[in-house]
């Protein structure tokens, strides 16, 4: 069964806490939004609903409160939680139905979505959950190589400019 969601990387992490692996992820409206308009500002469901559907959603703060007295989802009355969750699912599907046709109009962004962004969802979810092992010796060796290369590039820049300057100074670079 193919699934549509909003911020599925987060959902995968939550479900993993209960040893549930989310499979069949096909579409993520947060990623669709990023690809369609990466500079649009916020890509959370409430903002996307307002932007794409002209619909103001029930916010989590409306049902849970805010600050130190904010309730957790399992403390919210079932009727309120159900209304919130149902709207969340409905809005997510409506967003997908609006954005997906737009994404399909351009092969480049569609390719990024299908072949890069979506396959990365489970990978990044696991990385966030488990971390990444790093070999300190290899990291140190790379750091030394980069530092050496940086010195070489600075010398080359000085030769081109005919004088030494601070390469991280906007004022020096402008002059």
Which residue stretches match the model-derived regions?
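Short, charged alpha-helical motifs in flexible N/C-terminal segments and linkers
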Residues: 166-167
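Short His/Asp/Glu-rich catalytic/ion-coordination signatures at enzyme active sites or charged loops
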Residues: 73, 119-147
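Conserved small/polar residues in nucleotide/adenosyl-binding loops
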Residues: 171-175
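A structural signal for well-ordered alpha-helices, especially hydrophobic packing surfaces
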Residues: 96, 100, 124-127, 131, ...
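Active-site-proximal helix-loop-helix substrate-binding element of RNase H-like nuclease domains
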Residues: 1-105, 116, 124
């Amino acid at each position: 069964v193919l699934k549509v969601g909003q911020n599925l990387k987060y959902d995968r992490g939550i479900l993993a806490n209960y040893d549930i692996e989310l499979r069949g992820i096909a579409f993520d409206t947060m990623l669709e939004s990023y690809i369609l308009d990466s500079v649009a500002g916020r890509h959370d469901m409430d903002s996307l609903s307002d932007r794409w559907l002209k619909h103001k959603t029930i916010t989590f703060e409306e049902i849970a409160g805010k600050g130190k007295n904010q309730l957790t989802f399992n403390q919210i009355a079932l009727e309120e939680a159900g209304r919130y969750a149902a709207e969340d699912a409905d809005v997510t599907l409506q967003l997908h139905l609006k954005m997906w046709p737009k994404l399909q109009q351009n092969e480049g962004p569609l390719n990024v979505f299908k072949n890069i962004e979506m396959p990365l969802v489970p990978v990044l979810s696991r990385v966030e959950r488990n971390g990444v092992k790093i070999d300190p010796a290899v990291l140190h060796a790379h750091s030394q190589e980069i530092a050496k290369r940086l010195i070489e590039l600075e010398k080359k820049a000085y030769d081109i400019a005919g004088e030494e300057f601070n390469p991280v100074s906007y004022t020096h670079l402008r002059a």
